[in-house]
Amino acid sequence: MTAHVGVLALQGDTREHLAALREAGAEASTVRRLSELAAVDALVIPGGESTAISHLLREFDLLEPLRARIAEGMPCYGSCAGMILLATEIADAGVPGRAAVPLKGIDMTVRRNAFGRQVDSFEGDIDFVGLDTPVHAVFIRAPWVERIGPDVEVLARADDHIVAVRQGPMFATAFHPEVTGDRRIHKLFVDSL
């Protein structure tokens, strides 16, 4: 059976993730409404701006239903801002009232914009657990993981910082594999469903 994976389409790299998921063998659709969230087997939370996505989750009445689906074990993959939101704790979450809100899917503390501002964005090849050759990773105002819980597996590091993790059905990267054309990370996620 083909997994139906939703891409949270409130803000961020929606189209790129949809294409990557389809190329990786999944049925993929956008999620903007509660009915669409209820219809998917798994969810991708794309890169974008974590405080903006948090605000829109509240505005669209998706925050608590999404937290509930995650608590029930719905598989999720978060890239960049998605990694930030999947954390149990966010360092430098933003201005109170407009801060990024943790969805508490992965037992980790993530620091927003840890590698620096937009001008500090970079690309590089990194080793990734489960892949035979390095991944070309694109870091755009990227976070890094500062703390992981005992059940979290580190999948990749860059400059000695944790940039990819997995905990059960939850998977996250600080970088943007959807923009490189390399579908191996999306395939790892889809194949885990």
From Swiss-Prot:
Pfam families: SNO. One of its GO terms (biological process) is pyridoxine metabolic process. GO terms for cellular component: cytosol; glutaminase complex. Its EC number is 4.3.3.6, 3.5.1.2. It comes from the Bacteria. The keyword Hydrolase applies. The keyword Cytoplasm does not apply. It catalyses: aldehydo-D-ribose 5-phosphate + D-glyceraldehyde 3-phosphate + L-glutamine = pyridoxal 5'-phosphate + L-glutamate + phosphate + 3 H2O + H(+); L-glutamine + H2O = L-glutamate + NH4(+). The active site is at C80 (nucleophile), H176 (charge relay system), E178 (charge relay system). Keywords: Glutamine amidotransferase, Hydrolase, Lyase, Pyridoxal phosphate. Signal peptide: none annotated. L-glutamine binds at G48, E49, S50, R112, I140, R141. Pathway: Cofactor biosynthesis; pyridoxal 5'-phosphate biosynthesis. GO terms for molecular function: glutaminase activity; pyridoxal 5'-phosphate synthase (glutamine hydrolysing) activity. Catalyzes the hydrolysis of glutamine to glutamate and ammonia as part of the biosynthesis of pyridoxal 5'-phosphate. The resulting ammonia molecule is channeled to the active site of PdxS. NCBIfam families: PLP_synth_Pdx2. In the presence of PdxS, forms a dodecamer of heterodimers. Only shows activity in the heterodimer. Belongs to the glutaminase PdxT/SNO family. This is Pyridoxal 5'-phosphate synthase subunit PdxT.
